[in-house]
Amino acid sequence: MYAQVKSFMNLRTKSKRPSLRELSSVSKLLSPRSRCAFIKNSLGFIIPWLKKKNSIDVLNLNFVNYKQLDNPSIYLDPKISLFARPQGTALHWLAGNVPVISLISLFQGLLTKNKNIIKVSKTFKNLFSIIFNDLENNFKINKKYNKTFKKILDSVFIVYVDYDEIKEMEYLSINSDVRVIWGGSESVKKISNLKKKINCKDIIFGPKVSLAYISKKKIKTEKDLKIFSDLFVNDVFNFDQLGCNSPHNLIVEKGTKFSLGKISKIIAKSFKERKINSETDPVNKYNLLVKNFTYSLEKKNSIISAKNYEWNIFLIKNFKIHEPVYNRSIFLSSAKSLKNLCEALPENTQSIGLYVLNSEKPMIVSKLSEKGVDRFPSIGKMSIYSNPWDGYLPMQNMIRWISY
């Protein structure tokens, strides 16, 4: 591994780095046939990220003039010219819950023209075999993009390292210029404490939780409630709630026209209509059984569950934000006011999906963002991975500014 990594890091990559024009058209590398297979078998949610429009949108969000990534230019003061250079080598530590999400940071590493090392646990070696088999069988490249695709592949190196291989992990860490770390609390702490260069930039996406909120003014009819429910199921079922942007609690503002019982039944109907493609993990199933038993002891609580606990709705009469149990499980409760919600929010809340009136959003976002919440997507769009993420515009930390 050491020789391979050293060789990759020492590559003279200036001529091999694709230009922004080439990278922003990367989705065209896929023919219609291969694109459909790619979506079905592996990384469907990544495709929108590869489209030219999204590439340009992300670049515009991160930089006043993203063309500075290609060429020097005058910036504001005519006496100052700036040029954005890549930091060098970006090391992407793959997340354990939803490993393919880390490809989003890889894409941004490519856009900023860094060399990219993807550190994969041996646990996920089979996952990448499936992805690359899919590519081999279905990936058709238009001939005019062959050079671009080769440049992209030359900018990426995948290495398998296990969690207990400290020597190998430290070697990767100390030879990187950017560390993009995805993972839980224990993993993030362990990786962060590895030796690194003094000027190495860390971009950390640590453990986060998310929830959803309904205002009493938003739902006036049963039709409104059904529309909400059909949108909400998209957020809950995505990645079986393993993503940090998946809601685990649904908070309804007190005073709505509908009781929690009525709301839970309509949500359950939407859950029943959704096809489930993955089986419940045995450990999670055991945890769900324990939760079901615990909550059934409280007379005020009630539970709606699918066969084999494929999804669960815990109806909680006393407002409280509960720890996730995963596998499409929701805790439904009612908060007296926004103030009560603010007081109950966990410190590591990432996203709050909103189903509120547009006129209410500025006040709600202002109040809840004071508690450290970074994202307020609309219900149905919580699972969209967009910039900024966890309060970061990652590409700003992937480049260094040259002035002259």
Give the residues covered by each predicted segment:
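Generic structural signal for well-ordered, non-membrane alpha-helical segments
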Residues: 1, 12, 16-19, 23, ...
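Amphipathic coiled-coil/heptad-repeat helices and related helical stalk/stem segments
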Residues: 102, 164-165, 337-338, 360-361
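Short beta-alpha junction loops
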Residues: 121-126, 356-359, 383
